[in-house]
A protein has these predicted regions:
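Metal-dependent de-N-acetylase/amidase catalytic core
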Residues: 1-7, 24, 28, 55, ...
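ATP-dependent adenylation/pyrophosphate-handling site
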Residues: 3-11, 15-55
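Short, conserved clusters of charged catalytic residues that mark active-site
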Residues: 16-17, 59, 93
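Generic alpha-helical hydrophobic packing signal
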Residues: 32-35, 65, 204
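Short glycine-rich catalytic loops that host catalytic nucleophiles or stabilize transition states
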Residues: 37, 78-82
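Glycine-rich phosphate-binding loop and adjoining beta1-alpha1-beta2 segment
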Residues: 42-71, 75-76
Length: 237
């Protein structure tokens, strides 16, 4: 059994990136924790005003709880970093929050955003997670680190601007795609109409394409950032 930690920027990113994989983990007896660091609404206004958007923020938090319940997530942690403004924060402040969560949850596996992404929050969180997951002697060791793609964001980053998302790790979600799509439907304010890529149809098309890459009906794709194999006999001595 593994302890799994998903670290995402905004409500729905955790499901867009690895919702089917989360379901697979839960079904095999793993414990999954989801962390959503930014509040996900106020960037739609010229100026951040959380009081003005209080009702929408409250509803989005409820949607996140419902969506993660659909997947069987053990714990959902909602922080309130400013939406699409995380470049205005000291990166160390983001790192410290993630380090505290890692120290408490002690995950074996961490999923987070790919660096080559048009969304600034996704990039800042990728950088912070990389730092927080350093394999430092005497601290908790994250054995596996994986980066996911986020539709309507990762694919919009031009290849000359940042590293392309070129996956080298695939997860068959043919038996969990329906749960992923159901969870996304909980996000009433986030999903769009087809042919927007962040639509139910767009997510399904991507899962079919990634599945066809490996000869299955549906898949999620990742980049393996780090994989540490530990001799469990020596670890327990």
């Amino acid at each position: 059994m593994s302890n799994v930690l998903v670290i995402a920027a905004h409500p729905d990113d955790e499901i867009l990136g690895c919702g089917g994989t989360i379901v697979n983990h839960v079904r095999q007896g793993d414990t999954v924790h989801s962390v959503i660091l930014a509040e996900g609404i106020t960037s739609r206004d010229p100026k951040r005003d959380r009081e003005e958007r209080y009702d929408q923020l409250s509803q989005l938090a409820k949607d996140a709880e419902k969506a993660n319940d659909v997947l069987g997530v053990h714990e959902l942690i909602l922080d309130q970093f400013p939406d699409n403004r995380m470049d205005q924060l000291d990166r160390l402040d983001i790192i410290k929050v993630i380090e505290q969560i890692i120290d408490r949850v002690k995950p074996d596996i961490v999923y987070t955003h790919h660096i080559g992404d048009v969304n600034i929050d996704h990039r800042r969180i990728h950088e912070a997670v990389i730092t927080a997951c350093r394999p430092i002697p005497g601290q908790h060791l994250v054995k596996q680190l994986l980066f996911f793609e986020t539709v309507s964001s990762t694919e919009w980053m031009p290849p000359q601007s940042a590293p392309n998302f070129i996956p080298n790790w695939y997860v068959d979600i043919s038996h969990s795609i329906e749960a992923k799509l159901k969870a996304l439907q909980s996000y009433t304010s986030e999903m769009r109409e087809w042919p927007h890529p962040r639509s139910i149809e767009g997510v399904q098309v991507l899962s079919e394409w990634r599945g066809s890459n490996i000869g299955v009906h549906h898949a999620e794709a990742f980049i393996l950032g780090r994989n540490i194999l530990i001799n469990e006999n020596e670890e327990n001595q």
